């Protein structure tokens, strides 16, 4: 029997699995994380295409061959439902997700909370923000009950990402009237060029389908 999970952080989960399964952890547990969440929860929001093209990370204990035995069979099943799979060290995974998943959630939450403080219940004014505002605050509706545990189990990486973003925002704030602002836009445009256009595309060295 193989046990797996779909949690957003992996280091603490793997450590707990080692405590539970001991020397058998490599054969009994496979840590997984599908990058295909939604801001809504519950069966009424189920989506049959949720995993189509989505990245699905797997992290192993030291020396575990995740593509062999029951782990390999499960990964083949994940690929069969349309997800793109990749193996990644747990610590590397948690740092990456702090930047590409957890930080965006905190940005959306902070922006939405700031708008409530600034404009309260003045919905007509907020609706004037249009598509940009809706896109930036879409995941602000995500449940705290889920994100509480993510923040607790990845707090060091998330704090580091938040600190670096704070420094970046401070730099922008101090350079609204200088050439530095244009350079920030140039960096942002470069990211748009290198980020995969389709959901779930992974570097060939990491991906397996």
Language-model segment annotations:
Residues 10, 33-39, 62, 92, ...:
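Glycine-rich beta-alpha junction loops
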Residues 1-44:
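Rossmann-like NAD(P)(H) cofactor-binding subdomain of soluble oxidoreductases
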Residues 44-50, 149:
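Short, flexible, solvent-exposed loop/turn segments with mixed acidic/basic and small polar residues
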């Amino acid at each position: 029997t193989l046990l797996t999970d779909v949690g957003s952080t992996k280091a603490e989960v793997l450590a707990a699995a080692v405590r539970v399964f001991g020397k058998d952890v490599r054969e009994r547990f496979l840590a997984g994380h599908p990058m295909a969440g939604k801001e809504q929860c519950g069966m009424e929001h189920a989506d049959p295409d949720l995993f189509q093209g989505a990245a699905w990370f797997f992290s192993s204990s030291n020396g575990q061959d995740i593509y062999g035995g029951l782990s390999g069979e499960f990964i083949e099943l994940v690929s069969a439902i349309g997800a793109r799979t990749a193996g990644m060290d747990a610590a590397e995974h948690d740092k990456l997700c702090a930047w590409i998943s957890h930080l965006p959630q905190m940005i959306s939450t902070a922006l939405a909370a700031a708008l409530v403080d600034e404009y309260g219940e003045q919905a007509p004014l907020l609706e004037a923000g249009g598509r940009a505002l809706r896109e930036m605050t879409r995941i602000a509706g995500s449940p705290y009950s889920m994100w509480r545990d993510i923040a607790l189990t990845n707090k060091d990486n998330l704090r580091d990402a938040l600190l670096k973003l704070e420094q970046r925002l401070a730099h922008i704030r101090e350079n609204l009237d200088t050439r530095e602002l244009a350079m920030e836009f140039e960096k942002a445009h470069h990211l748009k060029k290198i980020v995969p256009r389709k959901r779930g595309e992974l570097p060939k060295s990491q991906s397996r389908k």
